[in-house]
């Protein structure tokens, strides 16, 4: 027996070589022995021929370690030294010599408060200590790796920096909270890595880092060490303005975008735009069209293109398809400098079963429920988060904070909220488990959503939290202290379904379905609704909006323009999916660019101009937004004219805000001498007319000017005779010189 072998006790050397010794920090590295009278250094370096200990303070050699065995175990005492010091290992390999700062000499970098909040379920910044983070310890720079895997037998970090050797960097286990960590000097930015986990049954699985801030694109799935240099923000003016804005009283016209298919480049459109391309083309386009916000479909890294991002694996990693995290930040910064907000679709309802992802992460159902009646989503064959587990709540809460704080995003739109709220969602009897009170509500998910919204609104000024919720669940946008979920807005799925159904009917039969456009006002003030025509309505065989409308091309385009006019006049914020603003003919295909060539044709140009002018009018006149959620902001003039399929109403603002009158005709009949009530006396004029030749219409209208008469009508003291264009929308307002000059539409 050599002297070196005496440094490994109780078979620890054999256990280490077999991967069975998990408390490696108690064995490897520098340790005091003989009651503090000596120091020993132990290391495990495969293929090493010689190892010397070098002082980091002066670069001098302190000692040479003895080889314990051919497998790569080395150990040795350090002469008379008894006080620990920072050191490197000078390792001689067959073809090279390397100086390696031994990671096993460093203590834990975790603090008690972080660990407590993470386990409790209230950590807002878990990404600062989990994942891969650049740190400096005793003037030594490196990457701190940390992962939650409480049921793993052993966890190692493997990557480019250790030739993917699972024995090289076994991590420190914190048994009490299930975290594993290691601080690695010498790692370079851009290094690829994974966590190598040994399960209790002995199986080994390589997993992507759940907290990775960058990942490879599919089909590869390694995590990537982030860059040290971060984007320098220049959007202070926007952020200050955002914080002072009450968005429920402000205009919000949202352009929904899937970055991979808005435009493409390459000879055959086979290449994605990168973030610089999007800065140069998407932002000016959105600005010109007058939208206030862009809503991005999910950008968290996802392996399957056909999921459109709604089955993410790297929840913290912006997809590498379009560039890195700094590129994404630069895009958002440029949007803000152009006074365009950016919202993000956020998927917290489920996650996919890709083996490198969260599924059975440490050999157990860590993030999901064990019982498939609670843990599996029947529609998408995905897994449902365990919202009752503190660490899972912290994982999701921190992720929401990460996007909003680190990327300056202006809000999140939560996908598939209905599937979170109900335990029996898309399940037959016997396929679900009731809650503790025997009900169908998912109480843990409800509590999580309330906590999420309450914390985000308190911590991050001026953001918008938006729910895609398709049921009649009460109080989605009510405050949490009133037992609501606490969202700022809810998609109005009822209005969307009813109005699109109406749109698809032949004009001659629309009179029998008049209530499909009026019914939404019966419940418009029960929630803070957002009118959304999203990607879901123009895919999976549903056809484009233009395709849904019966008739010849003239009728299709005219009807679509009138529909948009009705939508922009209806109370509630607006969202429109890309391509709909110029009446794309085919339904959306995520593998191809939008059909921009259609803009060579006048009808498509006309719809685009109409949307642009609607947005300009919408942003200019407070009556169209300031009282969206107050009944006094809207009044029907006539909601019962089903015979003519004409809808007329007034939008009001506050104080001296100019009221606007909308008249929408959903048949191809021209109505001349049509009397309409007006909210005040004096001259009125057409602010916008969707039948104008400017938009591809037949130019039926009122010559721009309407003379009000002191004849009460429709509950108004004044009225006028007007011409209502076929399949058209008129927007009327007081004909004051000041307003006309300012509108300049």
From Swiss-Prot:
It holds the Pfam family CBM_48. It comes from the Bacteria. One of its GO terms (molecular function) is 1,4-alpha-glucan branching enzyme activity. InterPro entries: A-amylase/branching_C, Branching_enzy, GlgB, GlgB_N, GlgB_N_E_set_prok, Glyco_hydro_13_cat_dom, Glyco_hydro_13_N, Glyco_hydro_b. It is an enzyme of class 2 (transferase). The keyword Plastid does not apply. GO terms for cellular component: cytoplasm; cytosol. Keywords: Carbohydrate metabolism, Glycogen biosynthesis, Glycogen metabolism, Glycosyltransferase, Transferase. One of its GO terms (biological process) is glycogen biosynthetic process. It catalyses: Transfers a segment of a (1->4)-alpha-D-glucan chain to a primary hydroxy group in a similar glucan chain. The active site is at residues 415, 468. Transmembrane segments: none annotated. Pathway: Glycan biosynthesis; glycogen biosynthesis. Its EC number is 2.4.1.18. Belongs to the glycosyl hydrolase 13 family. GlgB subfamily. Catalyzes the formation of the alpha-1,6-glucosidic linkages in glycogen by scission of a 1,4-alpha-linked oligosaccharide from growing alpha-1,4-glucan chains and the subsequent attachment of the oligosaccharide to the alpha-1,6 position. Monomer. This is 1,4-alpha-glucan branching enzyme GlgB.
